[in-house]
């Protein structure tokens, strides 16, 4: 397939295909292309932080929604806490069981070579432009999430269709 050829051309060892595709598919569902690298770094940082603030949980809406058979929107609070959804990265630490889509080569490249950074969080604060803010602390994330909430208060129809936050 095209994806397998891309992985081979990028010199990804076959034993890493599953992990790379899983990470890249999440990156692609979560953020616009210009933020792929930063989102890939967030995933790496969260996976590495098993004893820290995030406890190795990705906490990505896109994975929860995939497990529910949906894309776009925001999981309801009870959906985000449901342990029966194996793709619920709010509950289950580490990567979900598999990819949540077929990622682009750009998303794969971002996962293979994420930029340096201490980011643990991100939130898309403008759903029209895709503007996404990255942060290293839960306090910074709370301030950024307030920006999304302010945007949503003025753009209810847009926000009811979805939020991207990780």
PLM segments and residue spans:
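Bacterial extracytoplasmic/cell-wall-associated proteins, especially those involved in peptidoglycan
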Residues: 1-166
């Amino acid at each position: 397939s095209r994806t397998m050829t891309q992985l081979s051309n990028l010199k990804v060892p076959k034993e890493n295909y599953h992990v790379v595709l899983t990470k890249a598919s999440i990156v692609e569902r979560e953020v616009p292309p210009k933020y792929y690298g930063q989102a890939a770094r967030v995933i790496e940082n969260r996976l590495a932080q098993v004893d820290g603030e995030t406890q190795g949980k990705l906490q990505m809406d896109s994975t929860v929604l995939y497990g529910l058979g949906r894309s776009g929107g925001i999981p309801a609070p009870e959906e985000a806490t449901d342990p029966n959804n194996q793709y619920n990265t709010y509950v289950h630490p580490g990567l979900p069981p598999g990819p949540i889509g077929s990622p682009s080569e750009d998303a794969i490249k971002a996962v293979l070579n994420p930029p340096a950074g201490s980011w643990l969080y991100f939130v898309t604060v403008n759903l029209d432009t895709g503007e996404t803010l990255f942060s290293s602390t839960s306090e910074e994330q709370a301030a950024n999430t307030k920006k999304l909430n302010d945007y949503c208060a003025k753009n209810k129809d847009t926000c009811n269709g979805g939020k991207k936050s990780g």
